[in-house]
């Protein structure tokens, strides 16, 4: 199907850190959308966008990119990407960022949605599932329009490790990962295939368990190696895939942190589940048939997210349905 031209689409990235900057680069180089890169630090988004613009002669893209400290310049965005907040440092879990990033995500989402009330919101700030819920509470949008990107990233990591283990092309591998974007995420080998062949027919349970564990700690492994900050190329690639779907004419089945209103027996929570994603946002949550052990793992992950939401409940207006898991 024909792609939309840059002039028909506008994406505003809230936060010009490593993930936000890498995402801006992917979007303009792929001629996906015009981009506004916003940050509170004066000069940072302007400098990054100038650097990206100076690559135009090499890359040949035609998208416009603007660096700004003014939310007014984000007006009329089709997609708002929440990338603001502090990144993980060695020894930190994603949940260590909870209180600080809640305040940041709530504020930037409210300000941006005020200028783009028809936008879809994609969250990449950690802890991802809780921050997706915070952004939804701040936005006032229908839940189908607010989501987090973690599932796409987690599945991509699982696919990469499987490809390395088997020596196959990663293009032939399709993985499914449910649950929170953290140590209790739930990779599903039964729903992971290589050219249609279930992973469970190609690897022993011991090898699969090792790959699952590495997937769960994939982000922490990068944090440890970098010593300062976390992953950004892979998260940016995952967010870009979601944005391309949201701006295009295709419907895709992707795992994202979506709002649940009874699916999988869970309510009033954002968590990684497979959804049908399109330019209309989350069209539908797809409920997979889970075995007892898989369902128990999913509920453990959900309770961890719920505990995080309970910690930050006092930071958000009590204008949404009561929580329940």
From Swiss-Prot:
Binding site for NAD(+): 15-20, 39, 101, 124-126
Catalytic center residues: 181 (proton acceptor)
BP-aspect Gene Ontology terms: carboxylic acid metabolic process; tricarboxylic acid cycle
Enzyme Commission number(s): 1.1.1.37
Residues holding substrate: 88, 94, 126, 157
Single annotated GO MF: L-malate dehydrogenase (NAD+) activity
Enzyme class: oxidoreductase
Source organism, top-level taxon: Bacteria
Gene3D superfamilies: Lactate dehydrogenase/glycoside hydrolase, family 4, C-terminal, NAD(P)-binding Rossmann-like Domain
Keyword list, A-Z: NAD, Oxidoreductase, Tricarboxylic acid cycle
Gene Ontology CC terms: cytoplasm
Keyword Hydrolase belongs to the record: no
Reactions listed under catalytic activity: (S)-malate + NAD(+) = oxaloacetate + NADH + H(+)
NCBIfam families in UniProt: MalateDH_bact, PRK06223.1
Similarity comment: Belongs to the LDH/MDH superfamily. MDH type 3 family.
PANTHER family (UniProt xref): L-2-HYDROXYCARBOXYLATE DEHYDROGENASE (NAD(P)(+)), L-LACTATE DEHYDROGENASE
Function: Catalyzes the reversible oxidation of malate to oxaloacetate.
Stated name of the protein: Malate dehydrogenase
Species this chain originates from: Gloeobacter violaceus (strain ATCC 29082 / PCC 7421)
Encoding gene, per UniProt annotation: mdh
């Amino acid at each position: 199907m024909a792609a939309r031209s840059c002039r028909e689409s506008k994406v505003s990235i809230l936060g010009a850190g490593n993930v936000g900057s890498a995402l801006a680069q992917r979007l303009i180089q792929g001629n996906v959308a015009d981009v506004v890169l916003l940050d509170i630090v004066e000069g940072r988004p302007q400098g990054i966008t100038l650097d990206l613009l100076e690559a135009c002669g090499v890359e040949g893209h035609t998208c416009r990119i603007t660096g700004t400290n003014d939310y007014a310049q984000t007006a009329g965005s089709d997609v708002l990407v929440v990338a603001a907040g502090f990144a993980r440092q060695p020894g930190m879990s994603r949940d260590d960022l909870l209180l600080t990033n809640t305040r940041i995500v709530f504020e930037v989402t409210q300000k941006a949605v005020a200028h783009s009330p028809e936008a879809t919101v994609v969250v990449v700030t950690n802890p991802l599932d809780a921050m997706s819920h915070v952004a939804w509470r701040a936005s006032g949008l229908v839940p189908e329009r607010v989501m987090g990107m973690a599932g796409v990233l987690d599945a991509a990591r699982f696919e990469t490790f499987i490809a390395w283990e088997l020596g196959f092309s990663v293009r032939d591998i399709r993985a499914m990962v449910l649950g929170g974007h953290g140590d209790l995420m739930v990779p599903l080998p039964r729903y992971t295939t290589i050219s249609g062949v279930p992973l469970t027919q190609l690897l022993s349970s011991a090898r699969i368990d090792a790959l699952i564990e590495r997937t769960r700690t994939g982000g922490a492994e990068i944090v440890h190696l970098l010593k300062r900050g976390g992953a950004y190329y892979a998260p940016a690639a995952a967010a870009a895939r979601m944005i391309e779907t949201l701006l295009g004419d295709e419907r895709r089945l992707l795992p994202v942190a979506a709002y649940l209103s009874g699916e999988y027996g869970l309510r009033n929570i954002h968590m990684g589940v497979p959804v049908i994603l399109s330019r209309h946002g989350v069209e539908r949550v797809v409920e997979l048939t889970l075995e007892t052990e898989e369902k128990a793992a999913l509920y453990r992950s959900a309770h961890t997210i719920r505990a995080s939401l309970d910690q930050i409940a006092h930071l958000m207006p009590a204008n949404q349905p009561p929580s329940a898991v």
